């Protein structure tokens, strides 16, 4: 398989626990094709990133690292990768929003996703598609993001989604992506706004009164497909910004 070792990091709790069965289906594809692989299960928040770091350290050769989970799992894995020169990163989406997979036009079918990854591994390094990543800095701490990074409403909604029972309920009836819409409407009328000042490339700050949110977008959509930045591209070396301020809630 093109000289690459295949590693999987699986969040079995994604898709309200259904990802465990999805992984079994993926394994069937791997076994039929006689693929050598290693699988690691993420057991708690932040574990996927730690597993990615450990995998990068245990193999000096080029590897293919696949996240089986939602956008959160994929982002953890990305932040755990220590050497992007030797790692090919893949995603098999099993989450609620799946904005990363949607932005990359990946198959929703796990088996087809696995087959696509196996076929891509046969290609040369030059055929690898490069994706931009954003970086957020706070003091001496830095974190990468694949889809978006925001403050205000969208950040609040993401925080609520981590603990919301609504997400589990909607996932069970295959309406998981509505989680973010429900929580957005709920939060919009209760959240506090704040005055802010935005700076772009050392330009004079832009004053924003009663800011509701600001999001730096690497892909066109977030929150389960909401088109926040229709012109955004993850391969142009730029971030797009979307902000709302000064309007009545």
What is the meaning of each model-derived region?
Residues 1-65, 75, 79, 115-116:
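ATP/NTP phosphate-donor binding region
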